[in-house]
Regions:
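Short, surface-exposed alpha-helical recognition segments that flank or form part
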Residues: 65, 239-243, 278-279, 365-372, ...
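Metal-dependent phosphoesterase/phosphodiesterase active-site architecture
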Residues: 94-131, 136-146, 150-165, 170-171, ...
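Beta-rich interaction/scaffold domains
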Residues: 24-96
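Divalent metal-dependent phosphoesterase catalytic cores across multiple superfamilies
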Residues: 97-305, 310-337, 382-386, 412-428, ...
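C-terminal motif of bacterial Sec signal peptides marking the signal peptidase cleavage site
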Residues: 19-22
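Bacterial N-terminal signal peptides that target proteins for export
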Residues: 1-10
């Protein structure tokens, strides 16, 4: 009985428990844990070819120019990874130059060109070593230098250039290379001066230091008794983007191919487009490394500054090595060093000067005065003439115009320049004034410095070819111009892409005011019958232009050429002769 009761109670308990459990809500099973993410610590996302290049090659290990070229290629690939762009990228990698190598090299006439030559170049900020090697071998090779056969070595001085704005306002390079407009780079500027060279000798030169050399350049010292020779003048390259770079390089290649015998190249300013505080060192770099590279390797440069070259960074001073006596010896020194200097080559006295600093000391647009020009530049002209009174020819080189016939003719500065400099030109009997700034081909004068009229009796042999248009507003070509009683003014258009166009007679008459005492403004040029001053070819040739000037026994022969293509071919634009029948006199203030 007890045993049955136990099993009965156990059965009853299990029945009740089952019933109770059956009445509860069904239990939803817990979801399984989500799978763990894959372990990515060892996974490397493949980089593109240009991304690898961007991280592998840094600016601090290579020269600034070669690394910027790589940055342009990287940016192009990131936008369009075509095979052509990738090939360019690989080429730029192969062209990278170690940071120790020099760039922006140039030779400058500095002092007596029979026995002296000056040199200038840049390196990255960390390179303080520098020297020039010169060898009396024409078209020398690296082997000639390595053979140490008469190599002259000159140690260079250096100056650290701090925080030069690299891109600045040059929008092309900002976009093309992904460089900030505010980026500033440091460089070392190296300067060396060779003295006691042998007159009439062809030299080759290179700069840098042991194992880190520039390409080889060439020059020839003036002969001891220099006879006939040729020099070149061109200006206003205004480097700012590839189109401007290419046009100026066309001109430089044409110079070297057309007149390989040229002794030097005159360049009166506006090397670059962007001046002021937002200027671009990249533009200067491209002028040296690309645009003018053919000429720079072939001959020394004779330079002075233009208004687009001015900047607080004084890039101009860092890049050239010209005579600085004016800054050291005259009361009012200009901003840049070496923009006012003279030299004699053969039978020509060259006055290289700048009117850019005319505003220093007392000046007035109202009465057209500048004590800087009249007192300091004027005194310097007299000193140059006094030191070299016997040359047959006197030629000035400056950027700004005393006379011009395009967009700058109505600026407010030319009346100041005329009022201050015409008496100086008259006193020193300047034969030829080589000018820039106006970007048009302009033959002016000879101009009587007192009446401001052309001396028509001094002109002969002009050819009438039809004009009245932008190609040739006057319709004249060629001609012989005698400078006995007035100066011949010349603007050789532009070696680059930035072009202005000639003003017509009608426009010049509208721009004239018959009250020359009025304040000069942007509408008036203040010279009556101004168009008559344009006595020869006057127009826009629409191609890069340079002029070869040959100093002959009886004349200065001008041959102007247009650069036709990228191979250095050129076509003749115009030929003129400058003659003189009187001997030069000593300025009256010196007698």
């Amino acid at each position: 009985m007890k045993k049955q009761s136990f099993f009965y109670l156990l059965s009853l308990f299990m029945t009740v428990s089952f019933a109770f459990t059956s009445c509860k809500e069904p239990v939803t099973p817990e979801p399984p844990d989500p799978p763990l993410p894959p372990d990515t610590s060892e996974v490397v996302i493949p980089k593109t070819e240009w991304e690898k290049a961007d991280s592998a090659y840094t600016r601090y290990d290579y020269t600034v120019p070669s690394h910027t070229a790589l940055k342009i290629a990287i940016t192009a690939c990131a936008s369009d990874p075509s095979e052509a762009n990738l090939e360019t990228l690989r080429l730029r990698i192969s062209e990278l130059k170690p940071k120790t190598e020099p760039y922006c090299m140039v030779a400058n006439i500095n002092g007596d060109p029979k026995t002296r030559m000056a040199f200038n170049w840049f390196t990255n900020d960390s390179v303080f070593e520098g020297e020039v090697q010169i060898i009396p071998v024409e078209n020398a090779t690296v082997e000639d230098f390595e053979g140490n056969n008469g190599v002259i070595t000159i140690r260079a001085d250096y100056e650290r250039t701090r925080k030069l704005r690299y891109a600045g306002k040059a929008r092309y390079i900002v976009n093309a290379a992904g460089i900030s407009a505010a980026d500033r780079y440091n460089y070392i500027a190296h300067k060396a001066l060779a003295e006691n060279l042998t007159p009439g000798t062809a030299y080759s030169w290179r700069c840098g230091y042991d194992g880190h050399w520039s390409p080889i350049g060439h020059f020839r010292t003036e002969d001891a008794n220099q006879g006939e020779y040729t020099f070149v003048v061109m200006s206003d390259s205004h480097i700012e983007n590839p189109t401007f770079i290419k046009e100026a390089r066309r001109c430089a290649k044409a110079v070297v191919k057309t007149v390989p015998e040229a002794r030097f190249c005159c360049f009166p300013g506006d090397f670059v487009e962007d001046g002021d505080a937002s200027n671009s060192e990249w533009e200067w770099e491209r002028w040296f490394e690309e645009s003018m590279e053919p000429v720079i390797k072939a001959m020394p440069m004779v330079v002075t500054d233009g208004n687009h070259d001015d900047s607080p960074n004084i890039n101009y001073t860092y890049h050239f090595n010209t005579n600085n006596d004016f800054n050291q010896n005259y009361t009012s020194a200009p901003q840049f060093q070496g923009i006012v200097y003279g030299f004699v080559y053969g039978d020509v006295l060259f006055y290289v000067f700048s009117m850019q600093d005319f505003w220093r000391e007392t000046h007035s647009y109202l009465d057209w005065t500048s004590t800087y020009l009249t007192d300091h530049i004027g005194s310097w002209f007299r000193d140059q003439t006094m030191a070299n009174p016997g040359t047959q020819w006197r030629v000035s080189l400056a950027h700004f115009n005393l006379f011009s016939g395009s967009d700058h003719s109505t600026d407010k500065e030319p009346p100041v320049f005329r009022h201050c400099m015409l008496p100086v030109f008259k006193e020193n009997e300047i034969d030829v004034a080589l000018q820039g700034h106006d970007h048009t081909y302009e033959v002016i004068g000879p101009v009587d410095p007192d009446s401001l009229t052309p001396i028509l009796s001094a002109i002969s042999d002009r050819e009438e070819v039809g004009g009245g248009n932008n190609k040739n507003m006057t319709g004249y070509k060629g001609g012989t111009y005698c400078t006995d009683d007035g100066t011949f003014y010349f603007i050789g258009a532009t070696c680059g892409y930035k072009r202005y166009y000639p003003h017509s007679r009608e426009r010049m008459e509208r721009e004239y005011t018959d009250d020359i005492n009025l304040l000069q403004d942007d509408k008036h040029h203040n010279v009556k019958n101004y168009f008559d001053l344009f006595t020869g070819m006057f127009g826009q040739p629409e191609k890069p232009c340079f002029t070869a000037i040959t100093v002959k026994e009886d004349c200065l022969e001008f041959n102007s050429y247009l650069a036709d293509d990228d191979q250095g071919n050129a076509s003749l634009l115009n030929t003129m002769r400058i003659v003189r029948t009187k001997n030069h006199s000593i300025p009256t203030m010196m007698q």
